[in-house]
Amino acid sequence: MVSRYVPDMGDLIWVDFDPTKGSEQAGHRPAVVLSPFMYNNKTGMCLCVPCTTQSKGYPFEVVLSGQERDGVALADQVKSIAWRARGATKKGTVAPEELQLIKAKINVLIG
């Protein structure tokens, strides 16, 4: 039996965000998974935030360290994606402190 990857909370995945509209992050890029394994496995969906190497110093950026390239997670661009259909693959894992900071910044937006 072939083991298939299922994203888990805190995973850094590589995924295709196209198609997009307006100022949404587009193209193949990393994203931080926010939803737990059980939800992601059952639904084929996951909540995530896209990442970019182009930091602009916005208050909702979270710096990610220990990855292949320096970058930031965009905590104000939470997305629900069909990770199976978009061919998500695991790229790494973010530090627990970084995941908590992303969640804290999202909480500021949604209260």
Swiss-Prot record:
What does the entry report about post-translational modification of this chain? (Microbial infection) ADP-ribosylated by enterobacteria phage T4.
Top-level division of the source organism's lineage: Bacteria
- The set of disulfide-linked cysteines is none
Please list where the region (Loop 1, participates in catalytic activity) is annotated.
17-28
Q: Is Aminoacyl-tRNA synthetase one of the keywords UniProt gives this record?
A: no
Q: Does the keyword RNA-binding apply?
A: yes
> Anything noted about its domains?
Loop 1 (residues 17-28) effects catalytic activity while recognition of the ACA cleavage site is influenced by loop 2 (residues 53-61). Alterations of loop 2 generate new cleavage sites in addition to retaining the original cleavage site.
As for family, the record states: Belongs to the PemK/MazF family.
Q: In which organism is this protein found? A: Escherichia coli (strain K12)
**InterPro entries cross-referenced by the UniProt entry:** PemK-like (IPR003477), Plasmid_toxin/cell-grow_inhib (IPR011067)
User: What quaternary structure, including any partners, is listed in this protein's UniProt entry?
Assistant: Probably a dimer. Forms a heterohexamer composed of alternating toxin and antitoxin homodimers MazF(2)-MazE(2)-MazF(2). The binding site of MazE and ssRNA or ssDNA are largely overlapping; the presence of only 1 MazE molecule inhibits mRNA endoribonuclease activity. Binds to EDF but not a mutated EDF (NNGNN).
Q: Name one GO biological process term.
A: positive regulation of programmed cell death
The record's top EC class is: hydrolase
Q: How is it used?
A: Can be used to produce large quantities of a single protein if the gene coding for the protein does not contain any ACA codons. Up to 90% of expressed bacterial cellular protein can be the target, which can be produced for up to 4 days. The system also works in eukaryotic cells.
Per the UniProt record, which EC number(s) apply here? 3.1.27.-
Give UniProt keywords alphabetically.
ADP-ribosylation, Antiviral defense, DNA-binding, Endonuclease, Hydrolase, Nuclease, Quorum sensing, Repressor, RNA-binding, Stress response, Toxin-antitoxin system, Transcription, Transcription regulation, Translation regulation
Q: Gene name on record?
A: mazF
What upregulates this protein?
Answer: Expressed in exponentially growing cells. Induction has been reported to occur after amino acid starvation in a ppGpp-independent fashion and to be Lon protease-dependent, but also to not occur after amino acid starvation and to be regulated by ppGpp. Also induced in M9 minimal medium and by chloramphenicol treatment. MazE alone and in combination with MazF, represses transcription of the mazE-mazF operon. Fis activates transcription. Part of the relA-mazE-mazF-mazG operon, there is also a second mazE-mazF specific promoter which is negatively autoregulated.
Q: Which portions of the sequence form the region Loop 2, involved in substrate recognition?
A: 53-61
Coiled coil ranges = none
Q: Under what name is this protein listed?
A: Endoribonuclease toxin MazF
Deletion phenotype, per the entry, is: Decreased sensitivity to dramatic intracellular increases of ppGpp. Cells missing mazE-mazF survive high temperature, various DNA-damaging agents and H(2)O(2) exposure better than wild-type cells. Cells missing mazE-mazF produce more P1 phage than wild-type cells, while introduction of lysogens into a growing non-lysogenic disruption culture is lethal. Cells missing mazE-mazF show reduced biofilm formation, and survive antibiotic treatment in log phase better than wild-type cells. However lag phase cells disrupted only for mazF had a lower survival rate than wild-type cells.
Activity control summary: (Microbial infection) RNA cleavage activity is reduced when ADP-ribosylated.
Spell out the GO cellular component terms annotated for this protein, sorted alphabetically and separated by semicolons. protein-containing complex; toxin-antitoxin complex
Gene3D superfamilies registered for this protein in UniProt: 2.30.30.110
